[in-house]
């Protein structure tokens, strides 16, 4: 990768890391469900405008719309809700560390579902190291009562499973769809899925939204969804999907740094050591740095 692409990869990791900070801030003003709804709905409106203004031709079919529906659930609705509800009891920094297990879960699931994604020696080592990192973050002494006492952490770990299924589904069913079209379709379907629940159960909250919550939500949608997706498309076209794993390595440190600087939120020693172990696992999964030496 050239220096320009490295900057884009680092910037994407920073933007996605910022999503945990935005959730942390918005939880002070609105409900988790409303946070997710405003993020996907505002982002979808902006992306639809982009598609229209760019005069991108859409060849929609029932199958493609169905694929967008599934991707909306797996890549937006489920993980966004799980992370946002999880962050009610889990700090943004810790949430970003736990969410880094997405890559390990994707590798494991892909090896079971896809014929061309075998579990190589380096992948097995990377996944095992990643699992050790997650255990360190949770705390070995807390494992036995984890499901009962750490619901927020469980929700965030489950979000990684949803992202993993989404990555595999996209690889199989959306391979020939333009990334910007896929993102627009996915976010639009997410908005349509969530809208009935908003109208039925959150009508009072919609009416009570203030300028602060709307402003933060708009920033959240623009920075962490729209702008992030545009950079994602650029990386995908110019360097390939393989370099997106580097973003996964950058997200937790970015989230921790942003949360520490802006809201003074720090992680403990277990979480820090676990983070380093998880990053090591991701580097081994990526493989390129190991091959150099």
Please annotate each region the language model reported.
Residues 106-108, 112, 144-202, 231:
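Transmembrane alpha-helical segments that form core, pore/gating elements
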Residues 1-34, 85, 145-172, 192, ...:
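Glycine-/small-residue-enriched transmembrane alpha-helix faces in small-molecule transporters
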Residues 1-5, 29-33, 37, 60-66, ...:
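Juxtamembrane helix-entry segments on the extracytoplasmic side of multipass membrane proteins
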Residues 15, 19-20, 48-99, 135-136, ...:
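Specific transmembrane alpha-helical segments of multi-pass solute transporters/efflux pumps
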Residues 47, 69, 109, 121-141, ...:
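Hydrophobic transmembrane alpha-helices of multi-pass small-molecule transport proteins
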Residues 49-55, 103-125, 253-272:
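C-terminal transmembrane-helix exit sites in multi-pass transporters
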Residues 26, 35, 39, 86, ...:
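Hydrophobic/aromatic residues within transmembrane alpha-helices
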Residues 38, 76, 95-101, 169-192, ...:
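Helix-helix packing/entry segments at the starts of transmembrane helices
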């Amino acid at each position: 990768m050239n220096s320009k692409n490295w900057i884009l990869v680092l910037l994407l990791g920073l933007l996605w890391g910022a999503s945990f900070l935005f959730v942390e801030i918005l939880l002070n003003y609105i409900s988790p469900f409303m946070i997710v709804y405003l993020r996907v709905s505002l982002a979808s409106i902006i992306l639809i405008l982009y598609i229209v203004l760019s005069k991108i031709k859409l060849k929609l079919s029932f199958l493609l719309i169905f694929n967008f529906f599934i991707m909306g659930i797996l890549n937006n609705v489920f993980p966004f809700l799980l992370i946002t509800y999880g962050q009610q009891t889990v700090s943004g920094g810790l949430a970003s560390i736990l969410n880094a297990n997405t890559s390990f879960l994707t590798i494991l699931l892909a090896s079971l579902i896809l014929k061309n994604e075998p579990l190589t020696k380096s992948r097995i080592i990377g996944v095992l190291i990643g699992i050790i990192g997650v255990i360190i973050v949770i705390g070995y002494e807390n494992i036995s009562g984890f499901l009962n006492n750490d619901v927020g952490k469980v929700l965030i770990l489950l979000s990684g499973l949803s992202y993993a299924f989404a990555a595999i589904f996209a690889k199989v069913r959306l391979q020939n769809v333009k990334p910007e079209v896929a993102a627009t379709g996915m976010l639009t379907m997410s908005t349509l899925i969530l809208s009935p629940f908003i109208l039925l159960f959150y009508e009072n909250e919609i009416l009570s939204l203030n300028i602060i919550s709307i402003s933060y939500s708009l920033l959240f949608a623009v920075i962490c969804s729209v702008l992030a997706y545009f950079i994602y498309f650029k990386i995908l076209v110019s360097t390939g999907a393989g370099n997106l794993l580097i973003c996964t390595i950058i997200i937790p440190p970015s989230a921790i740094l942003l949360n520490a600087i802006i809201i003074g939120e720090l992680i403990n020693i277990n979480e820090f050591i676990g983070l380093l172990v998880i990053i090591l696992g991701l580097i081994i999964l990526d493989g390129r740095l190991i091959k150099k030496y």
